């Protein structure tokens, strides 16, 4: 986007501590962020899309306060659509096929299930549209995987960080608008659908999400199709087990 690059030039001229580097090759979200990381000098690295707009003024102070904890590797934020409904409040791994944002579509002030939409907490993954990570952790896990060009690079990255022993935190106090896919457009071409499907298969083959992965921050009695609602399939299966063992008692009316 021309206005994006014009803004980059403007802030680089106005601030001595701002350095803009340019990626000349084709789009690969992972490779581009790994490229930028090589030029960054701080102990904490912020991945921030150019299609977000800050709402919370002290975004860095809040996220840094969490990320400085020794057990934390990554901190993500609450992202909103421009109508002030939720676009991202943490990622549920195993939902939406492989992974999905929870609480999508509720109002930004809606507490959600058990207040989880408005409470900072540990999660399995957060979106990289706004993600703060320790430099040491980024280096330890080898950054983002280049094979995830567009989709699931953040989920894979977070799972790598969790596997390395660090927590992923959703900071409910930090809010931004997220105007999704402003630079690239939406996934609406045959080529992009194929690429998306390939990246889905890659994520599953790496983490075995469809077979064995269990999100530790989600109750297994709840549905992965209708988030935070009782999974009646599990409920009925449990009932049949109890009946077979002669241990079932019908609920009193």
Predicted regions: what they are:
Residues 23-40:
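Glycine-rich, basic loop-to-helix element that forms the pyrophosphate-binding segment
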Residues 45:
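Short aromatic/hydrophobic "clamp" motif used to bind/position activated sugar donors
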Residues 48-51, 145:
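Active-site acidic Asp-centered loop
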Residues 52-96:
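Conserved donor NDP-sugar-binding/catalytic core segment of glycosyltransferases
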Residues 75-78, 171-172, 179:
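Short glycine/serine/threonine-enriched helix-capping/active-site loop
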Residues 1-26:
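Acidic donor-binding segment of Leloir-type glycosyltransferases
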Residues 59-63, 117-142, 147-177:
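A short, conserved alpha-helix in the catalytic core of glycosyltransferases
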Residues 73, 83-84, 95-122, 132, ...:
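C-terminal, non-catalytic tails of nucleotide-sugar-dependent glycosyltransferases
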